[in-house]
Every structure is written in structure tokens, then in C-alpha cells.
Amino acid sequence: MARTTWPQILYDIEGNLLVSADQEISKKVIDEVIEKHQIQSSKILLSQTKVINDIQKRINSGIYKEMFANKETAEKVIDIIMQTSCTKLVVRELETLKINMPDTYNHILIVAALSIKICIDLDNPEFDPQQIAKIGLVHDIGKSRLPIEVIEKKSPLTHNEFGIIQTHPWIDHLLVSHYLNTTKSFIAQAALCHHERLDGSGYPLGIAKINNYVQTIIPCDIFDALISQRPYRSEPFTVRAALDILVAESKKGKINTKFVNCMISYARKDKPHYEDIKPSQTNRDATPKINYYGVRKD
């Protein structure tokens, strides 16, 4: 299980002290935070924010222009996001991320959009696209509280530094619970679990039972992280190399194969149905020459 203590003082977007340095983030602490602050944040439709324009830019850039080539579906994705409401404090978190950590902000937007697209294409009545939009848009806001020197480190992380990285799902959970003024938020719980894996090898809880919303988020999260520039590697993964990793992870039972096949379908020009996907059996592209992800200094 990943560490649950936070080495720095943690504040919300309004400057309220939530957690003291080296205090454990637990359900008890979250209960205390909610009881103390009793946040009453009004909601706003995302159609009234700049998030919409920024998502449109993301789905029309790079590989995502190909993945959202079906204009009808792309318009549905945008429409769902426009009709989704968030607390104004969450929107402020996103606005702050856009200024201070634009890469994380853009990552959050495209993960939300891809996850919604999968929901639309699966056409499963049990999926609420607006619910997954909300989860996608908060799944990494906790990274805004991580030390920038750790986030932008180009050399291998120490075990302690990686432990700090692993706290961000807990910070996601704390912030969302705080802003929604409840410890029983499905959205906050989903944000907590976005680094879990179906074989129990993920973090921070190390659980194997993961709800379908989170299972949808996971391959989208991994894919964009791989094809994006990161300080700890020499260049991004190619689309093919990134998809190969998703396939390998699904074969190991770590992530949902159905959702991985959706991602493969989106990247192909002929857009086959996800049930007809037959992934390549061999790695087709080389990985970055320098990649310190998963490498520890001590």
C-alpha cells in the first residue's frame, strides 16, 4: 500500500488549511476536514467555462485529431461536457492547473474526453457519461500539490520521491470530498482509485476490485501519459509503442482489454469495431532511448 502521509502543509484553492505536514490522509481526517470547513460551493455548467474551448483544442491536435475523427461522436463528447456541472472550486482548481501545470491540465482534459468517447461507443445504459466526465476532470488535480522539483525531475526518483508521487490520488480524494462536502462521493472515490490495477498491483490501496468507470479512465490515463513529453524520458512513446504497452498490461490482467481495444480502434484509420480488434503480437515501435519511469535511485 502506498504512503498516505503528506510531507507538506496542504491547503485548498481558497487557502484553507486542510492537512498539516506529515499528517496521514485518512477517512477520519477527511471527515474532520469536512466537519470543520462545511464548504458550500455553488455549481457551474462547464459550458460557461473555458474548459470547453480547451478540450476542443485538445481533440483537434496531434493523434487525437485521428482518434476523434468521427465528428458526430466528437460533438457528442463536447455536448456531454457542456452539460456537465462542477463546483466552482473544482473549476478554479482546473484554472490554476492551466497556469501552473499546463501539461497536467491538458492531460486531465483529454483523459476525460477519451473516457466519455468510450462510454458513448459502448452504449451501455449503466454508464453515465456525465459521471465519467466529472471523474476524468478531477482525477489528477492532486498533482497540483506535489513539489514541482519532484514532478519535473529528469533523473530517477528516489523511493521517497516516488512515495510522494503516490500520494496524489489521496490528495485528489481529499480535495474532491472537501469541495463536495461529503465523504461518500463516488467521484472522489473513483479519483482515489485511478492508479489501481485489476490484479491488485496498483496504488494507493492495492485493490483488485475496480468499478467500470475507473476501468475506463485507466487506459486513457496511461496512453496520454506515454505519448506526452515527460521530464524523465528523452522523447514521448510513439502511438504504436504506447498501444503495445496497453495490450501488454491487459494481457497481464492489469487493465480491461475491452477498453484497450477501444483505444486501438480509435488510433486506426479504418476504425474497426472494438470487438473485431486483433492486437499485434509483437512490439512494432521502439521505446524511448532514455526512460527513467519506474527506475529508483536508491
Regions found by a protein language model. Name each.
Residues 111, 134, 138-145, 157, ...:
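Alpha-helical scaffolding flanking metal-ion-dependent phosphate/phosphodiester catalytic sites
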Residues 5, 13-14, 89-92, 141, ...:
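Residue-level signal for pocket-adjacent positions within structured domains
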Residues 28, 35, 136, 152-155, ...:
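Alpha-helix termini
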Residues 30, 85-90, 106-114, 127-135, ...:
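Hydrophobic transmembrane alpha-helix bundles
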Residues 3-4, 10-11, 81, 122-123, ...:
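Intrinsically disordered, low-complexity segments enriched in polar/charged residues with Gly/Pro
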Residues 1-93, 236-298:
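Terminal helices and disordered tails flanking the catalytic cores of nucleotide-processing hydrolases
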Residues 37, 44-166, 173, 178, ...:
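Acidic/His-rich, divalent-metal-binding segments that scaffold phosphate/diphosphate chemistry
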